[in-house]
Amino acid sequence: MKSALTALLVFAAAPALAQPAAAPPPVPAQLPFSPAVPAGGLLFLSGQIGQVPEGMDRHTDGFDAAVKGAMDAIGAILTSNGLDYGDIVKCTVMLADMTDWPRFNAAYLPYFKGKRLPARSAFGANGLALGAPLEVECIAALR
């Protein structure tokens, strides 16, 4: 009986644990994902591509703008969930061109000034969403 009750409580609580996190509206409603989902004491953020503004070249002025766009979108999702960059425990970085890795690092580091750097992986990816030059996906610890 005790194990059946425990199973029932876990089953009943599971939908509440998997509810999408509150977030600003940067992701259009027709896209098939949530900006972030809390589970197991963590907040899993969807990848952010940081759109390059029209008329900018991705590999000159546009790349830095894309990094800023992605990291600012991550910051907005964190803020809407009562968190900040210091709560990030892991980031995965996908770059369309691995020669942009030093430029990415230079633009990424200021977001963690005075904070612990999260664990991170980075790899080259052929064909990111919407032709983006990068995508950044993070996991944050909930408070």
What are these regions (language model features)?
Residues K2-K90, M94-R143:
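N-terminal presequence-like segments and the immediate start of the first folded domain
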